[in-house]
């Protein structure tokens, strides 16, 4: 999402913020019933509790991508997530389907850390250093333009759910991979596959240079210097506090956390894995969870028979995810009901052509 898109978005009328929760719930329910199968609302795990009850599907990035690709009925897809997710949905659905983001300010700081101009500047430098031995792999948390570049160069997208499988495949295709934009997911996945940390380099997009002290021939993974602003805030100190004060607690974290945190946790995995593992755990078990606050709160509500806390007691929700709220959802649905188009997410054909190659490779491998 660029600045122009943000400036050009429609502004929600103030009266929506003045409505009561009950009034908004009643209106959203009414419109959903009226539109029926013509409306589909996918919702990411990190969304607010006030939005989640209206979701037709709830999931992580991989689940929502798969669901979007399978849905051919709904004319209107109102995506309760962030910008790159809505872009992915637009590319995976038909040209007749319209994807809408209730608030265009719902971006992703990690996705914004990898700009297409930075990538096109980086690639020739890496080719000079390593020749044609690199396969680009991009986390699904990236812009459509980044996905398109990766697809055009034979690479694939990846999610936290399928990272081990996808990265393993990528390393069979070429001698080394260029993983972007999240260095932590890339590092944790590569390490899990047996690649030592000393064989991983950092690409600094600000300086447009490789940060690596070893022998270039030993470098197997090049990590873009990006990160999740939420998961970066889980620390080794948080884990030490849990071990000291709650020795029976099992610690599970998202692989977007730093390598130090993931290494000290009992387990790590995607939001789907975290939810499934805790839901299936025995009553009375204790958990400290290292992921986004809205999801942790929902896991606590759904598991009253277990003791569950956030690994970081001062953790905030993902603030860009939090921009999707009930007033914006209602505003969007009323526009659809009135035959108006608001905040449509549309990826151009050329970008879609190659981005789809990257997405389809991932979906086939998954």
From Swiss-Prot:
Cofactor note: Binds 1 [4Fe-4S] cluster per subunit.
Binding residues for [4Fe-4S] cluster: 108, 228, 318
Binding site residues for iminosuccinate: 44, 61, 139-141, 160, 254-256, 271
One GO CC term, this protein: cytosol
Keyword check for Transmembrane helix: no
Annotated catalysed reactions: iminosuccinate + dihydroxyacetone phosphate = quinolinate + phosphate + 2 H2O + H(+)
Cofactor(s) needed: [4Fe-4S] cluster
GO terms assigned for molecular function: 4 iron, 4 sulfur cluster binding; metal ion binding; quinolinate synthetase A activity
UniProt subcellular location: Cytoplasm
EC numbers for this chain: 2.5.1.72
Pathway: Cofactor biosynthesis; NAD(+) biosynthesis; quinolinate from iminoaspartate: step 1/1
Top-level taxon: Bacteria
NCBIfam families, alphabetized: nadA (TIGR00550), PRK09375.2-1 (NF006880), PRK09375.2-4 (NF006883)
Purpose of the protein: Catalyzes the condensation of iminoaspartate with dihydroxyacetone phosphate to form quinolinate.
Family named by the database record: Belongs to the quinolinate synthase family. Type 3 subfamily.
Name listed for the protein in its UniProt record: Quinolinate synthase
The organism of origin for this protein: Listeria monocytogenes serotype 4a (strain HCC23)
Gene it is expressed from: nadA
């Amino acid at each position: 999402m660029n600045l122009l898109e943000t400036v050009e978005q429609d502004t929600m009328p103030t009266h929506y913020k003045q409505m009561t929760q009950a009034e908004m719930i009643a209106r959203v329910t009414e419109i959903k019933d009226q539109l029926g199968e013509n409306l589909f609302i996918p919702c990411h795990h990190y969304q607010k509790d006030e939005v989640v009850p209206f979701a037709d599907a709830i999931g992580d990035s991989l689940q929502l991508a798969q669901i979007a690709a399978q849905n051919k009925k709904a004319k209107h897809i109102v995506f309760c997530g962030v910008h790159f997710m809505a872009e992915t949905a637009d590319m995976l659905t038909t040209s007749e389907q319209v994807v809408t983001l209730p608030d265009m300010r719902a971006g992703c700081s990690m996705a914004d850390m990898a700009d297409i101009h930075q990538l096109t500047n980086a690639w020739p430098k890496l080719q000079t250093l390593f020749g044609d031995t690199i396969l680009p792999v991009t986390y699904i948390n990236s812009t459509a333009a980044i996905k398109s570049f990766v697809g055009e160069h034979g690479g694939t997208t990846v999610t936290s759910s399928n990272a081990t499988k996808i990265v393993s495949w990528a390393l069979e295709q070429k001698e080394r991979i260029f993983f972007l934009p999240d260095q932590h997911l890339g590092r944790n996945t590569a390490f899990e596959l047996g690649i030592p940390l000393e064989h991983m380099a950092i690409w600094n997009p600000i300086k447009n240079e490789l940060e690596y002290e070893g022998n270039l021939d030993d470098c197997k993974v090049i990590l873009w210097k990006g990160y999740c602003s939420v998961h970066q805030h889980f620390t080794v100190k948080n884990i030490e506090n849990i071990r000291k004060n709650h020795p029976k607690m099992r610690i599970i974290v998202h692989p977007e956390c730093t390598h130090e945190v993931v290494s000290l946790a009992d387990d790590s995995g995607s939001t789907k894995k975290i939810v499934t593992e805790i839901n299936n755990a025995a009553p009375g078990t204790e958990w400290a969870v290292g992921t986004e606050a809205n999801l942790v709160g929902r896991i606590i509500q759904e598991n009253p028979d277990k003791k569950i806390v956030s690994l970081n007691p001062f953790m905030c929700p993902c603030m860009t995810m939090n921009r999707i709220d009930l007033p914006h959802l209602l505003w969007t649905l009323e526009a659809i009901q009135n035959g108006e188009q608001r905040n449509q997410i549309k990826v151009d054909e050329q970008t879609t052509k190659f981005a789809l190659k990257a997405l389809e490779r991932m979906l086939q491998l998954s």
